[in-house]
């Protein structure tokens, strides 16, 4: 079982006259406030305190520092009647703040993202039968049914009484007015049904059973461990880690499951309900404010036993957390790129260590970081070598576009066109993958050559023909598609260059007019309900051909889908991203894994101009280990992660000269020494974003050198003008 982490720093001495309070604001640290000493405050308690002319809710962080003289202290207004933040969450907030060089209050804000959850839950008005009915009470048959219901059962709300008795609401009100009913307040019902850990699950094959028993053993034993659960697509990894969740529930603990795209988790939720007889609590940005309030409070009170959520679910106040599962641990969506910049997979490992519980990292394409941690003995590994139920892995073929060229102004090669026709003729389903939203990535004028660019960024505007707009995918700027060139004013001369999913859909509709097509992108799937409905249509074979971006790679199971066509397998292979090859391999492997997941064999066609690229060869040969070994050698030879450490600095401001001046100041003060290298300053690849000029530094250091002390010493003395922002990204994943 998890051990207690209580320490003197987590308590407030009885009778203390001052306490430090951390506010959920991007401030340097806690502020001292006066307390009467009799309130009995402890670390993690919520309190209302004055800040300037307003009142805010903060968290007691410990005893006061004494840095402020007594005469200048302000009084705590009142404690808040809400479950306190658990001590381990307070330490987690501090750890994340120190690691990411973020203000502690900014991290605390993620743990207090639902202020309304701190309000006490509203009781439900109800009625019970009076102990003595009025002597003159006139009892009609309708009234008698109400009386009998309450005589034999508990108090009920008026609407429930009326419904069960088959009478109008006025009958209940009349009985109350006559003194036959007494008003009472009922506590709110449980927000979530309890999962049944002992409910029979699906039959596991021997490798699954072995892995499930090992995970369940670790959860039952407690203590911090990290296990990488690795297996081919369709191996049944989800059913394996469900047994780890069951072990946590049987031990009276909560379980947290992180998913990269919780809005696409409809199939996952169905599988969970089939195993445990109830649905878990959910936590993601598509919840309403009321749903978030209910979920936060249910987690804090221990009423929500299993929580599935996006990366921010890490910061919920679990009082009894027993296991963490990070599904699709390789997914780039776990990196938060704004506000407090953090990698949720890595922070989940930290949270598990601080809580002293096991964590499971799950993927068919584990990240190189996880692979190296397994190789170094820091993580344990469990492997599922085969698809569940006897399904075979698909046959992957690289289509050389240099030899098998698509027709002019088309994007599908003759081989892929024929495969699509044959698949649909056989009554099976196909999937076309192109990781590019919109109609075309570039629009140019055939008269003057002008390229339509975002006025706020150094990025091309993307045509979205379905809505008749040009959009910037970086800042959100959009404008109606012009009838004439903005530069030379020539009409009808704007041409689309390159394909997006909308243009691909247009081609497929012309090629296969009878096919029932559907598109799955962030433009067409606007929330969980839309995703659930589309997945249902594909499962029920109401769709013949599914076209989409990376959303379609996220673990979906479509038994009749036997063909996957990757329209541009080279997309994302090149550029300044050190993980470009790894990410491309992971994404294409996951997409390929949608084919042939049942009893029909699957086939994958990768359209590429580089069939000899190591990524393509690894996918065709099914040789992941060789690719990862080659990728590791390349990174290690230049000291790049996971064999070295990186931290990115991004300066930005509306005036390029002001940004450049600060960049030169930072360059002169840059740290140096053995194992330390500073790259930059240089214009960022995305040199202007939202009208702000951007300059980048990259701090590169040996694996045994922590970048945070270097960054604090380097950046501490620098005074930024109000117009210039400095963003620090420890362990960067984006290099734009």
Each language-model region and where it sits:
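Accessory, non-ATPase domains that flank or precede helicase/AAA+ motor cores in DNA-metabolism machines
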Residues: 1-363, 370, 375-391, 424-425, ...
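Cys/His-rich Zn2+-binding cysteine-cluster or related metal-binding knuckle/ribbon modules and their
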Residues: 26-28, 285-290, 301-304, 338, ...
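Accessory helical-bundle/CTD segments and flexible terminal tails appended to RecA-like ATPase motors
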Residues: 109-138, 449-453, 511-516, 527-546, ...
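Conserved RecA-like helicase motor-core motifs
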Residues: 256, 276-287, 455-456, 462, ...
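Conserved helicase motor "Helicase C" RecA-like lobe of SF1/SF2 P-loop NTPases
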Residues: 265-275, 444-456, 503-516
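Long, charge-rich boundary regions
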Residues: 471-559
């Amino acid at each position: 079982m998890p051990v207690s982490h209580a320490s003197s720093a987590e308590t407030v001495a009885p009778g203390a006259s001052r306490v430090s309070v951390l506010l959920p604001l991007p401030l340097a640290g806690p502020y001292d406030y006066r307390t009467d000493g009799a309130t009995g405050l402890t670390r993690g308690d919520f309190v209302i305190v004055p800040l300037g002319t307003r009142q805010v809710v903060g968290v007691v962080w410990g005893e006061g520092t004494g840095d402020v003289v007594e005469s200048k202290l302000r009084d705590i207004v009142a404690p808040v009647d809400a479950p306190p933040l658990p001590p381990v969450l307070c330490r987690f907030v501090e750890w994340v703040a120190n690691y990411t060089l973020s203000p502690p209050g900014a991290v605390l804000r993620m743990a207090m993202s639902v202020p309304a959850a701190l309000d006490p839950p509203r009781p439900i008005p109800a009625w019970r039968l009076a102990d003595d009915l009025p002597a003159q009470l006139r009892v009609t048959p309708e009234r008698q049914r109400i009386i009998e219901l309450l005589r034999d059962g508990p108090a009920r709300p008026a609407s429930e009484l009326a419904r069960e008795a088959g009478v109008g609401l006025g009958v209940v009100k009349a009985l109350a007015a006559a003194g036959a009913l007494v008003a009472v307040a009922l506590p709110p019902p449980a927000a979530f049904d309890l999962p049944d850990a002992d409910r029979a699950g699906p039959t596991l094959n021997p490798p699954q059973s072995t892995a499930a028993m090992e995970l369940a053993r670790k959860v039952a034993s407690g203590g911090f461990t990290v296990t990488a659960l690795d297996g081919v697509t369709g191996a049944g990894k989800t059913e394996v880690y469900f047994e780890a969740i069951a072990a946590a529930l049987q031990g009276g603990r909560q379980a947290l499951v992180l998913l990269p795209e919780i809005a696409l988790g409809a199939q996952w939720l169905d599988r969970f309900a089939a195993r445990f007889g109830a649905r878990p609590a959910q936590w993601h940005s598509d919840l309403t404010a009321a749903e978030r309030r209910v979920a936060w409070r249910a987690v804090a009170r221990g009423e929500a036993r299993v929580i599935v959520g996006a990366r921010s679910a890490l910061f919920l106040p679990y009082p009894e957390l027993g296991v963490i599962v990070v599904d699709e641990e390789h997914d780039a969506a776990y990196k938060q790129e704004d506000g407090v910049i953090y990698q949720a997979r890595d922070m989940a490992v930290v949270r598990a260590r601080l809580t002293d519980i096991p964590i499971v990292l799950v993927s068919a394409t584990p990240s190189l970081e996880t692979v190296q941690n397994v190789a170094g003995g820091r993580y344990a590994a469990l492997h599922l070598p085969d698809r569940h139920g006897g399904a075979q892995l698909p046959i992957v073929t690289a289509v050389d576009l240099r030899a098998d060229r698509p027709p002019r102004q088309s994007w599908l090669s003759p081989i892929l066109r024929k495969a699509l026709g044959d698949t649909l003729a056989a009554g099976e389903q196909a999937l076309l993958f192109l990781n590019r939203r919109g109609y075309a990535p570039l629009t140019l004028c055939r008269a003057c050559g002008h390229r339509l660019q975002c006025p706020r960024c150094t990025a091309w505007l993307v045509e979205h023909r379905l809505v008749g707009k040009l959009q910037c995918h970086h800042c959100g700027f959009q404008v109606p598609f012009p009838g004439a060139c903005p530069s030379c004013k020539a009409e009808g001369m704007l041409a689309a260059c390159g394909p997006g999913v909308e243009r691909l859909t247009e081609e497929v509709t012309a090629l296969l007019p009878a096919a029932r097509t559907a598109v799955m992108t962030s433009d067409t799937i606007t929330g969980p309900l839309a995703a659930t409905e589309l997945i249902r249509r594909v499962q029920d074979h109401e769709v013949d051909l599914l076209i989409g971006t990376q959303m379609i790679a996220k673990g979906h199971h479509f038994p009749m889908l036997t063909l996957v066509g990757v329209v541009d397998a080279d997309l994302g292979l090149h550029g300044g991203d050190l993980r470009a090859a790894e990410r491309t391999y992971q994404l294409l492997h996951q997409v390929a894994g949608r084919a042939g997941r049942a009893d029909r064999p699957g086939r994958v066609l990768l359209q590429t101009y580089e069939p000899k690229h190591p990524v393509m060869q690894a996918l065709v040969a099914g040789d992941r280990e060789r690719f990862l070994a080659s990728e590791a050698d390349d990174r290690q030879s230049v000291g790049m992660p996971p064999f070295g450490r990186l931290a990115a600095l991004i300066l930005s401001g509306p005036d390029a000269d002001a940004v450049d001046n600060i960049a030169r100041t930072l360059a002169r003060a840059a740290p140096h020494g053995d194992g330390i290298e500073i790259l930059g300053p240089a214009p960022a690849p995305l040199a202007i974003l939202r009208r702000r000029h951007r300059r980048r530094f990259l701090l590169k250091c040996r694996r045994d050198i922590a970048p945070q002390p270097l960054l604090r010493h380097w950046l501490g003395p620098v005074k930024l003008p109000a117009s210039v922002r400095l963003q620090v990204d420890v362990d960067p994943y984006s290099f734009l």
